[in-house]
C-alpha cells in the first residue's frame, strides 16, 4: 500500500496505468496557514476525480503561480536571472506540469549557472529571510481540512516535527 501526495494536485492519479501492482491510496498535500505558521496537511483517501478537489487544486496552483511570479521578479531585480518570463518558462519546464515551488527555482538557478547546486540556491536566495522567500496567503488550515473531508479524505498533519508549537 502506498500513496502519492504531491503538493496541490492529484493529477498523478490520472496518468497511472490501470494495473501497477500496488494498492494506491489517493492523496494530496496542501499548504495552509495556522497561527501565522505555514502548515502542510496531507489528505489521504481523497477522491482524485472529485470536481471540488479539482477546483481547490486549481486555486492552489494559481496561488503558487502568483507566488512564482513574485519570486521571479525579486530574482530579476537582483540580476540573478535574465528575464522574468524566461525564468517562469524555465521553472515550468522543470516542474513538468506539477505546481511550481522554490525547489524548481533552485534547479533553474543551477541550470542557468547562477548557483553551483540547489543547496547553494536555497542558502543564498530561497530559504527563510532571503530574497526569494516569498510568503503567500495560504488558506486557513481548517478550510483545507474541510476540502479534504468533502472529498472523502482523512486529513493528516505533514512533517509534524517541523512545527515548533506547544
Question: What do these predicted ranges mean?
Answer:
Residues 54-55, 133-134, 165:
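Acidic/histidine-rich helix-loop elements
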Residues 81-137:
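Hydrophobic, aromatic-enriched interface-forming segments
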Amino acid at each position: 500500500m502506498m500513496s502519492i501526495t504531491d503538493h496541490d494536485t492529484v493529477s498523478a492519479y490520472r496518468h497511472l496505468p490501470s494495473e501497477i501492482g500496488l494498492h494506491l491510496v489517493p492523496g494530496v498535500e496542501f499548504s495552509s496557514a495556522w497561527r501565522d505558521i505555514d502548515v502542510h496537511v496531507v489528505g489521504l483517501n481523497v477522491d482524485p476525480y472529485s470536481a471540488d478537489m479539482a477546483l481547490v487544486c486549481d486555486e492552489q496552483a494559481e496561488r503558487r503561480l502568483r507566488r512564482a511570479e513574485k519570486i521571479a521578479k525579486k530574482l530579476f531585480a537582483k540580476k540573478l536571472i535574465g528575464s522574468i518570463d524566461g525564468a517562469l518558462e524555465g521553472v515550468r519546464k522543470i516542474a513538468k506540469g506539477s505546481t511550481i515551488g522554490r525547489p524548481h527555482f533552485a534547479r533553474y538557478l543551477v541550470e542557468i549557472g547562477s548557483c553551483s547546486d540547489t543547496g547553494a540556491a536555497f542558502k543564498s536566495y530561497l530559504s527563510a529571510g532571503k530574497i526569494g522567500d516569498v510568503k503567500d496567503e495560504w488558506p486557513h488550515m481548517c478550510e483545507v481540512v474541510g476540502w479534504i473531508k468533502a472529498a472523502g479524505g482523512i486529513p493528516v498533519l505533514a512533517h509534524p516535527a517541523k512545527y515548533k508549537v506547544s
